[in-house]
């Protein structure tokens, strides 16, 4: 039976569905995000449907020191975290130098630094107990550079690389690390990143559901997989096709997908 999981970015999308799926397995939860009302709604739904306990911690992890503040609050609960799911993250459409620098830096704070900090702090606790599982929600975006989302693609490349290295370092100590790299998923991400009018965003109707992606990633984590891409077609593309294409062609293709017609 699963034990307590800490899930960041749990107020919507993949994080929301991951929390429900973990609860369906009988595990308690600590969930965090900025939107307290959404967290309370999720807590109520889960505790109504499952015999588990849910602790909410409303917090903005995109500010400096957010991860340390979260860790302190988690420790104060007295709960031992057996599963860490680093899901919180956001993107942003536009030419890098035309976007607000503050937003780009916040993206790095949340998508990269928070992942590193929580992995370090909670991973250390897991090693001491001799067991633990981590799921880092990355993206197929991490397999290529991403013009018009330069920072977002780079942060996901970091997460995918980092997760694999952590798995190699900690697996013999009883701790595994899985990078979930989905393609397009029907969540709030596209609206928040102002991608809804792009060629990519216009294909949202064909995207995977957050529920199916969450279940796929969670199951991959429990199986100790290293990298999990939620569709075979995406996996084949990023692993076997894209690396063979000329670099500038790939850049032009991605720029076209992320442009507004």
Regions found by a protein language model. Give the residues of each.
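Residue(s) in the substrate-gating loop at a strand-loop-helix junction
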Residues: 139
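Conserved NAD(P)H cofactor-binding loop of Rossmann-fold oxidoreductase domains
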Residues: 87-92
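SDR active-site lid
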Residues: 169-234
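Conserved glycine-rich cofactor-binding loop
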Residues: 11-13
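Conserved glycine-rich Rossmann-like NAD(P)H-binding loop of the short-chain dehydrogenase/reductase
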Residues: 25-41
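Active-site helix of classical SDR
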Residues: 119, 155
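Substrate-binding pocket helix/loop in short-chain dehydrogenase/reductase
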Residues: 95-108
């Amino acid at each position: 039976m699963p034990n307590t999981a800490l899930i960041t970015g749990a107020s919507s999308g993949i994080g929301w569905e991951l929390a429900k799926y973990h609860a369906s397995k009988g595990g308690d939860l600590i969930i965090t995000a900025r939107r307290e009302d959404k967290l309370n709604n999720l807590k109520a739904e889960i505790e109504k449907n499952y015999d588990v306990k849910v602790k909410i911690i409303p917090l903005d992890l995109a500010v400096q020191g957010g991860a340390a503040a979260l860790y302190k609050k988690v420790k104060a609960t007295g709960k031992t975290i057996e599963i860490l799911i680093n899901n919180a993250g956001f993107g942003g459409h536009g030419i890098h130098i035309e976007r607000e620098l503050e937003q780009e830096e916040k993206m790095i704070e949340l998508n990269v630094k928070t992942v590193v900090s929580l992995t370090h702090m909670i991973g250390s606790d897991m090693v001491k107990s001799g067991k633990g599982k981590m799921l880092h929600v990355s993206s197929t975006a991490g397999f290529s550079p991403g013009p018009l989302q330069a920072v977002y693609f780079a942060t996901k490349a970091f997460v995918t690389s980092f997760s694999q290295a952590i798995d190699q370092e900690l697996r013999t100590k009883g701790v595994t690390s899985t990078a979930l790299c989905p393609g397009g998923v029907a969540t709030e991400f596209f609206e928040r990143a102002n991608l809804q009018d792009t060629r990519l965003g216009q294909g949202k109707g064909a995207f995977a559901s957050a529920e199916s992606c969450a279940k796929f990633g969670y199951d991959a984590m429990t199986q100790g997989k290293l990298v999990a891409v939620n569709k075979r077609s995406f996996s084949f593309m990023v692993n076997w096709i894209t690396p063979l294409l000329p670099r500038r062609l790939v850049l032009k293709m991605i720029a076209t997908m992320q442009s507004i017609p």
